[in-house]
């Protein structure tokens, strides 16, 4: 185990806080990603990492009272809230495309975690 359970939990919550902080910053102070594909890829990657951290913590017992599907739905709700709160931030707007990329990253993390779990179960 490269990272201890406690450390992984803190990394996940710090990552979530960083997502929320960056999305709370007015757009005029952030670097501009003019390329649509680059912005979409950034959203997908950020939420892929969050999902991988979430499901790794689940595998290690942090959220074991919830199913992986329940955690995915909670993360999707958080992504939607994160996108929705940007309506209150100067020069920011809600983007359905950004939300779709966020959900895509979470879904990809979900399927990766299922694949890893199945591989692990077969090898035991």
What are the residue ranges of the model-derived segments?
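Membrane-interface helix-boundary motifs at transmembrane edges
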Residues: 1-6, 59-66, 122
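Membrane-interfacial alpha-helical segments at the cytosolic side of multi-pass membrane proteins
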Residues: 45-61, 104-120
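Membrane-embedded alpha-helical segments that form the functional core of polytopic membrane enzymes
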Residues: 64-80
């Amino acid at each position: 185990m490269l990272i201890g359970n406690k450390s992984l939990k803190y990394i996940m919550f710090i990552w979530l806080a960083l997502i929320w902080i960056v999305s709370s910053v007015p757009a005029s102070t952030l670097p501009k990603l003019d390329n649509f594909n680059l912005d979409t890829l950034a959203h997908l990657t950020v939420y892929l990492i969050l999902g991988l951290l979430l499901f790794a913590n689940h595998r290690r017992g942090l959220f074991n009272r919830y199913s992986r599907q329940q955690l995915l739905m909670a993360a999707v709700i958080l992504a939607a809230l994160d996108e929705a709160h940007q309506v209150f931030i100067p020069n920011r707007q809600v983007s359905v495309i950004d939300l779709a990329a966020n959900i895509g990253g979470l879904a990809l993390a979900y399927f990766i975690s299922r694949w890893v779990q199945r591989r692990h179960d077969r090898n035991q």
